[in-house]
Amino acid sequence: MIDKLIAHRLDSPLLSLTKIGVPMELNSLSPLHSFTPNSLQISRRHFVRTVGAAIAGTPFLGTNQLLTAGQPESIPSAIPEPLVKKLYESFTPAQKSKVCFNWDHKDKHGLLRQHIRANWNITEPIVNSDYFTKDQKEMIEAIFFGHFDPSWHKKIRKQLQDDQGGYGEDQSIAIFGTPGTNQFQFVMTGRHTTVRCDGDSAEHLAFGGPIFYGHAADDFNEKANHPGNVFWEQAIKANQVYKILDGKQRQAALIPAAPAETKIQFKKSANDITGLQISEMTKDQKQEMQKVLSSLIEPFRTSDQTEVRKCIKAQGGLDQCRISFYQSGDIGNDQVWDNWRLEGPAFVWHYRGAPHVHVWVNISDDPHTQIIAS
């Protein structure tokens, strides 16, 4: 198991970050963190439940109840943004110096809060380390799982167990700006994980900025049917659309080679987007495309799902997007396309299924929005 996890850490090089100015500083990233493939552990959350209910104004149940055997999966979870403020206020000056940044902090790549990678840690301190207190760890866990729909919590834990040895074993956090103001962002990074929340500080962006998710379930090189991969169902939905396309439509949708998976910046012109335009589909095909979109946003909390749909509407709806399927990387040569992409003027959802699942997401209501992906 350890060998598998270490091998998976080779997905991409780690990002090196330089120090920033006073009063907030960040040291360069440490070497690869060691994995501890312990069995799934769930910590106490009484503190988080109490704090969250007080600051959010309404009671909620902790994530431990979401994972208790026999409990329904529709139990609501914590709202992340109020807890981010409480977490930030709990930090000592020394802690802030390692995990907090000015809102517009830039590194050698550019604006750090708009950076995205497949395998990285913005900061050194690992969540399940002694760097954070027990109460802070519980808040971080509630914040993280608050990004996702409760029905997906068990699947996300499985992904983290397979990819990182469990929740918090190779994840780190960063906070930009000052939570509680109109400029802040919480980011959690790790292998196959970049999620954000910002209370709409970045008003044009869904998810608060670009996000990344992925999974290598059984092995780095997955089989054609991707057994155990929690995100493979999304590709199945997309391939169902391909199956009902006619010959001319398939010719437009099927592209020989996929672009580099990091190429998720918006195109300068909509004419540069490849693939089959959704507006050229039949009514039944468009309905299937709506199912694909619903499948893509299903793992995430309701407010983020709403924001995605709002951004799509602002750019003319799903009709203005195109879907591409890539012949390259067809595991098993079965014409179930592992690599595919849904793209519009200010919308990119790039799904790379070979050798295992990597998904890059960049969505805005403004096609001029700039991000950094590497």
What kind of feature is each model-predicted range?
Residues 1-46, 55-56:
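N-terminal secretory signal peptides
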Residues 54, 61-62, 154, 303:
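Short, polar/charged, Gly/Pro-enriched helix-capping and turn/loop motifs at alpha-helix termini
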Residues 72-93, 97-374:
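A cross-kingdom marker for long, charged
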Residues 8, 23, 54-57, 70, ...:
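Intrinsic disorder/low-complexity segments
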Residues 40-46, 57-73:
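N-terminal twin-arginine translocation
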Residues 51:
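Catalytic cores of secreted/periplasmic lytic hydrolases that degrade extracellular macromolecules
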Residues 13-15, 25, 56, 61, ...:
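Intrinsically disordered, low-complexity, compositionally biased regions/tails
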